[in-house]
């Protein structure tokens, strides 16, 4: 994970982004007019909480242990993703599919973290030494171990690339809405959030979409290093 001392910019930046995502998601959940929208918005609340917990290692590892291990969050968010895909199919729009892609990216991220953790645990079980690692475990390891991890994570990186593109597209769309203040068309608003009609609410809603999507993309960049090595340097 990240630390305030070694990756201070990323640590603080992600906390701010995810905290705002959580605040706005709770606001949407409280104001949700229907059961379907309420379920979808609370799913976003769960995701925002999970992303906050994923920032510091001291929070995420105990959380994973408490809920039964690294497979459990993958299953939880796979179910959430299935719900979001259903919502997108029911009320199809670019925005609704963007939200579905964001949850799919969360499943990919958690599955990749689970894989890296198993790779990093192997030297410990065999009695070999290992250096400390950060969020994804793909940095600050020996050259030999780094080569092994990159080879094992190549397919994960390839699978994650289109999801990262979707996250960035959603982040840009949210930022444009935050800047322009233009409301979404009622017929195109995804069922996963409350329709914002007031100018300030429109901007804040767009900012929340940007925060969640961009934060998810930023947090995941290091998982793409097997195919894009420069991504390892995006966590100052």
Protein language model annotation of sequence segments:
Residues 1-236:
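Alpha-helical membrane segments of multi-pass proteins
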